[in-house]
Curated annotation (Swiss-Prot):
Major localisation: membrane
Lipidation (S-palmitoyl cysteine): 318, 325
Recorded superkingdom: Eukaryota
Described purpose of this protein according to its UniProt entry: Acts as a GTPase activating protein for RAB5. Does not act on RAB4 or RAB11.
Any GO MF annotation of the entry: GTPase activator activity
Tissue expression summary: Expressed in liver, skeletal muscle, kidney, pancreas, spleen, testis, ovary, small intestine and peripheral blood leukocytes. Overexpressed in prostate cancers.
Cellular compartments annotated: Cell membrane
Disulphide connectivity of cysteines: none
Protein name: TBC1 domain family member 3
Gene3D superfamilies (UniProt xref): putative rabgap domain of human tbc1 domain family member 14 like domains, Ypt/Rab-GAP domain of gyp1p, domain 1, Ypt/Rab-GAP domain of gyp1p, domain 3
Membrane topology: Lipid-anchor
Domain Rab-GAP TBC: 101-293
Pfam family, one: RabGAP-TBC
Length: 549
C-alpha cells in the first residue's frame, strides 16, 4: 500500500469518526456506562433571544417591557403583510417596518419568503439530501467544519450542547453546501450565517436560504467567499471613495499610514455582522440586509467610520487590523433602535448622493457586449453602454454586477456545474431594451421599489397561521428527529447512484480531538437528553408579562 492509499484511508476513517460523533448526539465521547446527568432547567437563565446566561436574569426593566409590548403589537401587522404579500412586497412600508424590527415569531417566515426557499425546494426535490450524503462521504474540509461548528453560537440554547441536534443540522448544511457549490466550498463565515438561519428555519429551508443568499445578485455575498472576490474589490473601492468624500481627514490618515491595504473594513463588516456584536442587533441588521440587499453594506460601514472618526485618525500602523476590529465593535455597543435610526439616515443620504452602490465596472479589453444599467437607485438617467459584460464562459455562479441593476424577470434557466442554476434575465418590460420610464427618470429612487417585482411570489393558498410557517413559534423548535437521516435517504442515494451503497454503519469513534476549544471541557461531560431543553416558554405572549402588564 503506497503513501497515497494510506493517506486516503486515514482521511476516510477520520471523516467516519466525526460523522459518528454527531450521529450519537450528546453522548458522543462519553463512557458507555456513564448515566445521564439530571436535566437542568434554563427557564430563569435564558433571555427572549435564547442566549443562556451564567446567572439568573433580573426582572424586566420598564424599557424592556415596553419593547416586548411593541413587538407583540407589530406581530399582527407583519402577519397581515405576509398574508397579502403581493401588495406589500414593493411598498415602502415593508422597508419602514424592517428598520423598526421584525417580530421574533415572524422572522423565520419572512426570511423564507425574502430568499424564496419554498420555490427552490419545489424545483429541487430531494437535492439537499443527496448533497448531504455526498458531503459525508467526500468532504475535504470536514475537520475545519467540525471545529467551527463547535464554536458557533455556543451561548445560544440551541447550540449549547456539543454534538446536539442543532450542531448536527449545521454540520449537514455545511457539508451539503460544500458539495453543492465547489467554487465557494467552505469558509468559516458560512458556519455563522447558516447558524443564524437555523435559529428560525428548519434544516432544509436553512440550506436553501444559504444557497439563495450567496447566489442572489441582490445580496452579492458570494464575492466575499469566492476566490474571484469581485464583491470585496468593488465595495472596497466604493468605500474608499465615500470615506474620502465625507471624512477626508480620516482617509488621509489611512493613506498616510498605509492602513487601507492592511485592514478591509468591509471584510471586517461581514464578520461583525455574524460574530462580533449582540445577537439582537445582529438579527436586526440582517433583517435590513435581506430586505435592502447590498445597498445596506455601504451605509453600515459609513456609520462605523463616522462614529470612530477620532479613534481612526489616531490608529498607528502597529496592529491596525486588531485595532480597527475592536473599534468597529465599539460602534455597535449602544441601543439597537439608535443604531437602526442612524443606519436609515445614512442610507437616505448615500442614496441622495448616489453613493449607496459602487459605480459601474469599467469595460474589459476585448469585450464588445454591453447592456444598459441605471447609475444608482436615486439616479435620473441611464449610462447606456458604460459597462461591458466580462468575456469568456460563465462561472458556476455569475459574478456580481457592480451597478444598480434594473428589475429583472426570468427568461430561461441554465444548469451550471456544481448544482447551481443560472437564470438568463432581462429588464422587466424592456426585452433587453432600456425602459423609457427608467431612461427619462422619475421620482427619486422610483425604480428602487420596482426591483421587488422580481421578488418571490407568496403561494395564493397560504395560511399564515397554518403549518406552512414551521418554526412560527419557538414551540416547534424543539422537534426531535426520530428516524435517522441515513435510513430516510438511502433510497434517494441508491436511485441516483445504483453502483454505490449507503453506508449503514461507521467505524468506532475516536477520542475527541477539539484542541483549543473553550467548550471542550464541558462538552466531554455533557450528556443531556437528546431533545434538549424545551423552549416553549421563550415565545412572546402577553400572559408571560410581569404583574401589572
Amino acid at each position: 500500500m503506497d503513501v497515497v492509499e494510506v493517506a486516503g484511508s486515514w482521511w476516510a476513517q477520520e471523516r467516519e469518526d466525526i460523522i459518528m460523533k454527531y450521529e450519537k448526539g450528546h453522548r458522543a465521547g462519553l463512557p458507555e456506562d456513564k448515566g445521564p446527568k439530571p436535566f437542568r432547567s434554563y427557564n430563569n437563565n435564558v433571555d427572549h433571544l435564547g442566549i443562556v446566561h451564567e446567572t439568573e436574569l433580573p426582572p424586566l426593566t420598564a424599557r424592556e417591557a415596553k419593547q416586548i409590548r411593541r413587538e407583540i403589537s407589530r406581530k399582527s401587522k407583519w402577519v397581515d403583510m405576509l398574508g397579502d404579500w403581493e401588495k406589500y412586497k414593493s411598498s415602502r412600508k415593508l422597508i419602514d417596518r424592517a428598520y423598526k424590527g421584525m417580530p421574533m415569531n415572524i422572522r423565520g417566515p419572512m426570511w423564507s419568503v425574502l430568499l424564496n426557499t419554498e420555490e427552490m425546494k419545489l424545483k429541487n426535490p430531494g437535492r439537499y439530501q443527496i448533497m448531504k450524503e455526498k458531503g459525508k462521504r467526500s468532504s475535504e474540509h470536514i475537520q475545519r467544519i467540525d471545529r467551527d461548528v463547535s464554536g458557533t453560537l455556543r451561548k445560544h440554547i440551541f447550540f449549547r450542547d456539543r454534538y446536539g441536534t442543532k450542531q448536527r443540522e449545521l454540520l449537514h448544511i455545511l457539508l451539503a453546501y460544500e458539495e453543492y457549490n465547489p467554487e465557494v466550498g467552505y469558509c468559516r463565515d458560512l458556519s455563522h450565517i447558516a447558524a443564524l438561519f437555523l435559529l428560525y428555519l428548519p434544516e432544509e429551508d436553512a440550506f436553501w436560504a444559504l444557497v439563495q443568499l450567496l447566489a442572489s445578485e441582490r445580496h452579492s455575498l458570494q464575492g466575499f467567499h469566492s476566490p474571484n472576490g469581485g464583491t470585496v474589490q468593488g465595495l472596497q473601492d466604493q468605500q474608499e471613495h465615500v470615506v474620502a468624500t465625507s471624512q477626508p481627514k480620516t482617509m488621509g490618515h489611512q493613506d498616510k499610514k498605509d492602513l487601507c491595504g492592511q485592514c478591509s473594513p468591509l471584510g471586517c463588516l461581514i464578520r461583525i455582522l455574524i460574530d462580533g456584536i449582540s445577537l439582537g442587533l445582529t438579527l436586526r441588521l440582517w433583517d435590513v440586509y435581506l430586505v435592502e440587499g447590498e445597498q445596506a453594506l455601504m451605509p453600515i460601514t459609513r456609520i462605523a467610520f463616522k462614529v470612530q472618526q477620532k479613534r481612526l485618525t489616531k490608529t498607528s500602523r502597529c496592529g491596525p487590523w486588531a485595532r480597527f476590529c475592536n473599534r468597529f465593535v465599539d460602534t455597535w455597543a449602544r441601543d439597537e433602535d439608535t443604531v437602526l435610526k442612524h443606519l436609515r439616515a445614512s442610507m437616505k443620504k448615500l442614496t441622495r448622493k448616489k453613493g449607496d452602490l459602487p459605480p459601474p465596472a469599467k469595460p474589459e479589453q476585448g469585450s464588445s457586449a454591453s447592456r444598459p444599467v441605471p447609475a444608482s437607485r436615486g439616479g435620473k438617467t441611464l449610462c447606456k453602454g458604460d459597462r461591458q459584460a466580462p468575456p469568456g464562459p460563465p462561472a458556476r455562479f455569475p459574478r456580481p454586477i457592480w451597478s444598480a441593476s434594473p428589475p429583472r424577470a426570468p427568461r430561461s434557466s441554465t444548469p451550471c456545474p456544481g448544482g447551481a442554476v443560472r437564470e438568463d434575465t432581462y429588464p422587466v418590460g424592456t426585452q433587453g431594451v432600456p425602459s423609457p420610464a427608467l431612461a427619462q427618470g422619475g421620482p427619486q429612487g422610483s425604480w428602487r421599489f420596482l426591483q421587488w417585482n422580481s421578488m418571490p411570489r407568496l403561494p395564493t393558498d397560504l395560511d399564515v397561521e397554518g403549518p406552512w410557517f414551521r418554526h412560527y413559534d419557538f414551540r416547534q423548535s424543539c422537534w426531535v428527529r426520530a428516524i435517522s437521516q441515513e435510513d430516510q435517504l438511502a433510497p434517494c442515494w441508491q436511485a441516483e447512484h445504483p453502483a454505490e451503497r449507503v453506508r449503514s454503519a461507521f467505524a468506532a469513534p475516536s477520542t475527541d480531538s477539539d484542541q483549543g476549544t473553550p467548550f471542550r471541557a464541558r462538552d466531554e461531560q455533557q450528556c443531556a437528553p437528546t431533545s434538549g431543553p424545551c423552549l416553549c416558554g421563550l415565545h412572546l405572549e402577553s400572559s408571560q408579562f410581569p404583574p401589572g402588564f
